[in-house]
Amino acid sequence: MTSALIGYTGFVGSNLDRQMRFTARYNSANISEIRGKTYDLIVCAGIRAEKWLANKSPERDWARIRDLLENIKKVNAGRFIHVSTIDVYENSGEGDENTPINPDHCQPYGRHRYRAEILLRELFKDLIILRLPALFGPGLKKNFIFDLLNPVPRVIFPEKFWEILDKVGAADKKLLKSCYRMDAQFNLIPGLHKEALSTLHKILDQVGFTSLNFTHHKSAFQYYPLRRLKSDLEIVLNHNIQLQNLVTEPLPSDELAREVFELEFLNITDKPPLQYNLKSIHHRLWNNQEGYVYSKAQILDWLADFRANYRI
């Protein structure tokens, strides 16, 4: 069987690439080469998952998706598996695969990815869509789990950076300036020693600005372990499921911090806490009776293992 993976250098794609063998692999650098090809199976994890950037620059976000779809239009596939997101739902607090979606009520991030789903349905007769929640696994670069592991912000906007400098002493000011590089915003220089990161964390914690400041302690997210993607995909394929929410039992942020990181997390944000609680009509295939593919207890166990083996 011939197979292709689109997006093999991305977060989801790189994890799937470790778990499965593909005849060909594509990313943004060589995606045009897929035109005119025929594969028995194509897995597409090629749409970027930077929600804040998509909502900030929606035209640019859709242009990237459109360019990818223009290449995909030129390929033949016996079966096409598309990795999407649960953010296509207008209400993250309820719903399942049967819930109607009005993309006009979604933010650009969800609206564009739902639009991509619709276009792919028109292109491929045998299309499987996987809608994923927040993720964790090798290569993690964002979300609350990443922030707990990396409390020093990777990006600080100029106004906030100058505000922080006004609150610290000369030595701390010098360290901050040496560790962040100015572009459109201040970006943390990669490859800093653990000692420098630890000192930065103490400085920023004292002025009340770490990566953890962006999450309300009562926000509850659904986290999916990418280590399970191959086995869960096999369940979907074996049961000929066309649309699958790979959603897990919601995990409150304060509980995650306490149970996995031994941290008492009490942060309050200006915005109300987010509540993700989407379900799947296929949950019994995972021997779960609550509407999820995995329970909170299972996720906590996998998160503890992920933290123990995490490397910056």
Briefly describe each language-model feature range.
Residues 1-22:
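N-terminal Rossmann NAD(P)H-binding glycine-rich loop of SDR-like oxidoreductase domains
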Residues 126-129, 133-221, 228:
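NAD(P)-dependent short-chain dehydrogenase/reductase
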